[in-house]
Every structure is written in structure tokens, then in C-alpha cells.
Amino acid sequence: MAPLKSLLLGASLATLALSTPLATDAENLYARQFGTGSTANELEQGSCKDVTLIFARGSTELGNMGTVIGPPLCDNLKSKLGSDKVACQGVGGQYSAGLVQNALPQNTDPGSISAAKQMFEEANSKCPNTKIVAGGYSQGSAVIDNAVQELSTTVKDQVKGVVLFGFTRNVQDHGQIPNYPKDDVKVYCAVGDLVCDDTLVVTAMHLTYGMDAGDAASFLAEKVQSSSSSTTSSSSDAASSSSAAGTSSSGLSGLSSFFGGL
């Protein structure tokens, strides 16, 4: 007998095959109205921005941003923070977004995880001052989940927030990303989306996450803004301490002169 996940994967393939034309039509309409299509390479091909969004699409989706949630998430984030402040980058390369990879132990394959990890590392090396946020949908949620876990401490500290839609590792990882701050992760699992329950059964609810784009963008924007406030506060505290130290040093210098330079 074939493993349960293999049987479910076959059923899901049929479901996704039927849904793809509808998703493509919706994506084309969205791109014409708002601008972001199924591919975005603003980190790789553009200049550094204050914020960089790294996104991994779901299985069988087009481009490197997909159609269901990637493009509207990008546009909503730009709307909240400023279109000139945000660079959107989809995960491509070795990440082919194939279906069979969902049945692997990490719900994706090592090459896909490596492709996402490289995007985070490129953001860090090319734009060391950018604030990184990330998102993933369906298999892409597993790609981002696993990639963030593998980041060095330096790069991971640059990641301010993550949103995961139709999280395929929701059960295994307890609704969070291991070894990453739980408060900086928001998981979206629609009622009736069985993918979030450790199955590979794709229902209609798995295709509804576009409606969460605004809320998810607000979450990421808040994480970016709160990290900026923390940085400003730390800088102010450091400046105050430096000023106080300078005053103390001046006083000691005066005493030193008075006593002949002890």
C-alpha cells in the first residue's frame, strides 16, 4: 500500500491542477491593477531599501512570488511603509516549488532551503542596514521556516518578522519557527485548511490567503517600526551615557590639574 502522504499528494495534485488557471487569471488581473506580478527580484536587481521582503511561493505557483499571497503581501507592505522603502524578492533558483517535495521530512528539499537561505545572506551582505522580513505560503512556508533556522546569528538578528500562510509544518513546529522569537512570527491557518493539520490534502480554504495580505503586512510593518524605535532608543541611551562619561572625565581632568597630575 502506498504511504498515506503519497495518496494525499496525488489527490492534491488534481486539486491544484484544477485551481491553477483560476489563480493565474486572478494574478494577471491583480498585476494589471496594482503592479506586482508573480516575479519580483528587487533585491537581486535593484538598490538597497530600508526593508527587504523575502517570500517563498507555494507548490506549482508561477514565478518566484506566486499568485495567491506573495504579490498582495508585497504591495500592502509597500503601501504601509512606502514603495520607495521596500524591496520584494521571491525565492527562485533551486526552489522549483514542485509537489513531491512536500512529502519529504522537512516538507521541502535541501536545495530549496539553501536557495532561501542564500537570499537572506545576500540581503545581509549586499544591504547590511536593511531590515529583513519574510513570508512563505504552503511549501514556501516550510522553505522559510527551515531556512531561518539555519541562518547565522548575525543574519537571523536582521530578520525582524516572518509570516507563514497555510503552514505545512504547523503541527511539527508548534506554530512557530524553532530557535527564532515566537512573537516575531505570525501563522495564518484558515479554518478548514487541512494542510495546517499535517496532511497534504488541499481544500478550497488553502487558496484563500490573499485576504490576509493587509493584516500580514501590518504585522511586518509593526515589527520593522518597533525595531527602529528600539534602535533609536538604544542610540539615545548610548549618547546620554557618553555625554555623562564626558562630563565625569572633564571633572576628573580638572582635579588632576589641581593636584599636579596624579
From Swiss-Prot:
Transmembrane stretches, start-end: none
GO BP annotations listed: carbohydrate catabolic process
GO molecular function: cutinase activity
Region of interest (Disordered), ranges: 228-262
Cellular component per GO, a single term: extracellular region
Native species: Aspergillus niger (strain ATCC MYA-4892 / CBS 513.88 / FGSC A1513)
Positions bearing the site annotation: Transition state stabilizer: S59, Q139
The entry's keywords: Disulfide bond, Hydrolase, Secreted, Serine esterase, Signal
Pfam families named in the record: Cutinase
Main subcellular location: secreted
Location of the protein in the cell: Secreted
Biological function: Catalyzes the hydrolysis of complex carboxylic polyesters found in the cell wall of plants. Degrades cutin, a macromolecule that forms the structure of the plant cuticle.
Protein name as it appears in the record: Probable cutinase 1
Enzyme type, top EC level: hydrolase
Family: Belongs to the cutinase family.
Family matches, as InterPro entries: AB_hydrolase_fold, Cutinase/axe, CUTINASE_1, Cutinase_monf
Signal peptide: 1-19
EC numbers on record: 3.1.1.74
Catalytic reaction annotation: cutin + H2O = cutin monomers
Annotated active site: S138 (nucleophile), D193, H206 (proton donor/acceptor)
